[in-house]
Amino acid sequence: MGDSYYNYRPGKGQALVKQSVATNKQDLPDKCARRGNKLDGLKEKDLIGIPWMLAFALRADGWYLRQDIIWNKSNPMPESVRDRCTKSHEYLFLLSKNQNYYFDVDAIKEPTRRKRSVWNINKKAYKDAHFAVYPPELVIPCIKAGSEKNDLILDPFMGSGTTAMVAKSLGRHYIGCELHEGYGKLIKNRIGELRGTLEEFI
């Protein structure tokens, strides 16, 4: 999950968030700034901490926050800022609804050890998408460890359909939700391209 920097400009029609450290392109809608939605405690140029805010909100709602996982990118998006380091990681969170939950640690075991909490995975472009697409390798261990074959996978933000594609490849069913109507064709085409094994598709 990406994060953003705080840039409060009430009444000027500017975006509340100037820069997204996830893609260097994504901004919150202008209407947020026009409404003057200032978040308490945040100062100009503060890193908002959206991933952790979401994780803590889910925990407060009753979920169990079991682990944070670092997605380390060796080929991150370049940034022009000169007063901090270039952002090269994002967060994944392992959450559960109960204390006892399904987790197949052996399904994602590395050759000589159990999988660590820092995942080194390069970003990959998808030819038909003009936005950032996360790589299938990021989804594979999540689905392998968190579900069994014929289980149902839910992706509430479907985007280009990466999660659905991986779920289908691993013998799972899937449901995806996407507000942007234009992505429907992209999703169908991407899943339709899937032939043979997941490794062959990647």
Per-region residue spans from a language model:
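Core catalytic lobe of class I
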Residues: 1-194, 201
